[in-house]
Amino acid sequence: VAVLKTDMLVAETDVPRGMSLWQSARKAVVMNVSDFAAKGVQPKSVLVSLGLPRNLMGVDFEELAKGLNAGAREYGAYVIGGDTGEACDLIISIQLYGAANKKGLMLRSGAKAGDILAVTGFFGKSAAGLRLLLDEAYKTSVALRDVLVDAVLMPKARLKEGLALQRSGAVTASTDSSDGLAWCLHELASQSGVGFLVDGLPVADEVRRFAEVNMVDPCDLALYGGEEYELVVTVDPQMWSEAEDAVEGMGGRLVPIGKATRKKKVILDVDGIR
């Protein structure tokens, strides 16, 4: 079957202070590739529609083009065309194309009670990095700031991991975390007709350090930040080793954070407190 995806980046809402045009264009591609990763589909081609403000110069357009091409090639796709027009704000609309075996697609609707809930990384860095970019009152070391801000400016889609998980046949449901970990857990639960008990919230160590210094809740940063582009999957417990090996074979890590339950609620257990 043909697999199509479109998503739009608007500068006013999606491009924080400090993000270059090159990074903005690349991010627009990553946003779309992440959804392909969650389905286990290799993107092949990219169409781009650009809304360009009058104040952009020729060199700016060149930076956008380079960023789009870099993002596409990073994930094995090609920019094959598109359109441009004048707009009041920078708008980058991406249309991503690929093909897949319909039976092999990883959907959001297949989780079963007892399945292992897992993610491909730790959360909160984008939320913390965004706070650093938007508010100089937040404190951190130079090294930690670089890590957190890089999560915002150079996000990464987990395409290799998604393709490997699809090949493993171990995944029962899958989504990406671009809208925030909390939202995608509720979405998976709703689509699959299950609940989740999350007893291993995957908060990044860097986020815990940032939160301690700035007296903010690291759990909030991990749950509600968004734009992290990790995969959130449920795995048949009898095939856990296959799923784990598949991701590790791509240089990644599959982190168990809980399990699917019959109760249609998402419950967070932090140090025994629910």
Regions found by a protein language model. Give the residues of each.
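Helix-biased detector of long, well-ordered alpha-helical tracts
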Residues: 1-274
